[in-house]
Curated annotation (Swiss-Prot):
Residues 423-432 have a biased composition (Polar residues). It comes from Rhodospirillum rubrum (strain ATCC 11170 / ATH 1.1.1 / DSM 467 / LMG 4362 / NCIMB 8255 / S1). The lineage of its organism: Bacteria, Pseudomonadati, Pseudomonadota, Alphaproteobacteria, Rhodospirillales. It comes from the Bacteria. It holds the Pfam family PD40. GO terms for biological process: cell division; protein import. This is Tol-Pal system protein TolB. PANTHER family: PROTEIN TOLB, PROTEIN TOLB HOMOLOG. Residues 423-443 are annotated as: Disordered.
Length: 443
């Protein structure tokens, strides 16, 4: 098995170093080590992750660092409880040592991750791991990665994704990034920059300098481009930003107000809402021809469009029924149907990558809520609430949402929560932060 991975971000804007990670499958026997994540997990699986052993100072340090990131990813998912290394009975310095499963059962571990880091003659490092079912003594999955030393964090996220998938049966979401709006300064003179980070808050950097306010960044399906809205001299402009090259391209300089540009699933179009004639409608722009087509035609305000993952339908927010509600229509603008009928006002609908749910923001009784419902409007579930919670964005596996929360003092922070409503956690950022957008799994 071979996987080609790219995307080690440098501190300089737009520079990216290609990373080749060669993956070898270690022989395995499938064991029945399973977490059912569809119902919500209240009792995380106890998992032991001893330090990956190395043969010199560099590889030993990397082994410790890799285990730290893998542990944080898995623990942060809410599905796993990483056991305290002080309780470990057996040492596993490398893969040649056979686990004594009775020792791991004695500390109540259900899963065991064993690994090593080996320097190669060409300066690269081989990082290998095995996931064991402690009760059966069977190997669940094993992989080996060949990589440069400065790409250890990327490899760590990939390992965590492999473990997550092996136990849950679904794709992980750790080898991803988040773009967001970094906010500084007083509320009367707010500076809003485009920023990017790994999903765990590492590798933070700014993409714009703050000279003009930025809003609503969104990733392309390849995770290589971002579309966002910027106000320059009070004129809204929609840009495309290439993360790999650092090149910024003006997509359009639109009269009136423009809101929430977002890519189509095939990456060939951008959908947005524009107020061209004093009325806000939804438009779609073909990135190949730069031609726009109008999708809605109604005297109400239509905004916040989001494609279904197959591109055949669009969900959006409209007040055509009197109050703000969520609607679904075909990709050509036909067949408009209202799907939200609960109390309160609904906003910012966004379709899950799985296609099974639409997340939303809801305002009711002076409180804000983040929730999700099925595309037909059934099964509405509130996941969290607060003074102001807004801007949900999906992890690529459709199992976790990220959003921003503002307290009564105006401080904004990023948070994530499981789609079942468990495991809300704050994501650390160097400044206040809002309007997150989650990338697909990195190529």
């Amino acid at each position: 098995m071979t996987r080609l991975a790219k995307g080690k971000w440098r501190s300089t804007l737009g520079a990216m170093m290609a990373l080749a990670v060669m993956v070898a499958a270690i022989p395995q026997a499938r064991a029945e080590l399973v977490i059912d994540i569809t119902r919500g997990v209240r009792e995380p699986m106890p998992i032991a992750i001893p330090v990956f052993g190395g043969t010199d100072a560099q590889s030993s340090a990397m082994g410790r660092d890799v285990v730290g990131v893998v542990s944080n990813d898995l623990q942060g998912s809410g599905l796993f409880r990483v056991l305290d290394p002080a309780a470990y009975i057996q040492s596993l310095p490398n893969l040649a040592v056979q686990p004594q499963f009775a020792d791991w059962r004695a500390i109540n571990a259900q899963a065991l991750v064993q690994g090593e880091v080996q320097p190669q003659g060409d300066g690269r490092l081989r990082v290998a791991f095995r996931l064991w079912d402690v009760f059966s003594g069977q190997q669940v999955v094993g992989r080996a990665f060949l990589t440069q030393g400065d790409n250890w964090r990327r490899v760590s996220h990939i390992i965590a994704d492999e473990i997550y998938k092996a136990i849950t049966g679904e794709e992980g979401y750790f080898d991803t990034r988040v773009v967001y709006v970094a906010e500084t300064g007083p509320k009367t003179n707010r500076v809003k920059k485009l920023a990017i980070m790994d999903q765990d808050g590492a590798n933070q950097r700014n993409l714009t300098n703050g000279e003009s306010m930025v809003l609503t960044p969104r990733f392309s399906p390849t995770a290589q481009e971002i579309t966002y809205l910027s106000y320059y001299n009070s004129v809204p402009r929609v840009y495309l930003f290439n993360i790999e090259t650092g090149r910024r391209e003006l997509l359009g300089d639109f009269p009136g107000m423009t809101f929430a540009p977002r890519f189509s699933p095939d990456g060939n179009k951008v959908i947005m809402s524009m107020a061209l004639d004093g009325n806000t409608e939804i438009y779609e722009m073909d990135l190949r021809t730069r031609r726009s087509s109008r999708l809605t035609n109604h005297p109400s305000i239509d905004t916040s469009p989001s494609y279904a993952p197959d591109g055949r339908q669009i969900t959006f927010n409209s007040d055509r029924g009197g109050a703000q509600q969520i609607y679904v229509m075909n990709a050509d603008g036909s067949g408009v149907q209202r799907i939200s009928f609960g109390d309160g006002r609904y906003a910012t609908p966004v379709w899950s990558p799985r296609g099974d749910l639409i997340a939303f923001t809801k305002l009711k009784g002076g409180r804000f809520f983040i929730g999700a419902m099925r595309p037909d409007g059934s099964g509405e579930k509130i996941l969290t609430e607060g003074f102001l919670v807004e801007g949900p964005t999906w992890a690529p596996n459709g199992r976790v949402l990220m959003f921003f929360r503002q307290d009564p003092n105006g401080r904004t922070t990023l948070h994530s929560i499981d789609v079942t409503g468990y495991n809300e956690r704050q994501i650390s950022t160097p400044t206040e932060a809002s309007d997150p957008a989650w990338s697909p799994l990195l190529p």
